[in-house]
Amino acid sequence: MFGFAGTDYEKVRGDFRKVTDPYSGNEIFVVPAIRPDWAVIHAIRADGNGNVVCSALEADRLAVLAARQAIVTVEEVVPAEDLVARPGEIFLSALHIDLVVAAPLGAHPAGCVHSYGIDRAHMEEYLAASKTAEGFSEYLSRFVLGKTEEEYRELACGKAV
């Protein structure tokens, strides 16, 4: 990893190692791979088998590939034939996905490429609320706890889907 030279990471993180890059000869830091139990990502669409079409966010792909199991929430579950007809759009193979869940507006208040943008007003409300434990608790009570997906969408987005 670049950018750690001259920092205290080497002292405070015993699992960071400085090694010689075999390609450049420069000293670099390496870190152990993360192996989470689960990865959960949101995508544009997938078929029921788990073949996923989403924006080319490499972080999403890496999270799924690193995890022992993966869930993908999607704007739309489509028939497998729709994806087979356009194999170049498949970003993640069903081999890596354990569960597909239809969740329209599931990325809200963040955006979902080709579907909807960031809800800046709601994101600002969330960020302001999350600055304190009390504010975050109030946010959860208002928008999340005890709410159905439809109730959340109505409260947060002003529409039901």
Which residues does each predicted region cover?
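Conserved alpha/beta enzyme-core scaffold
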Residues: M1-V161
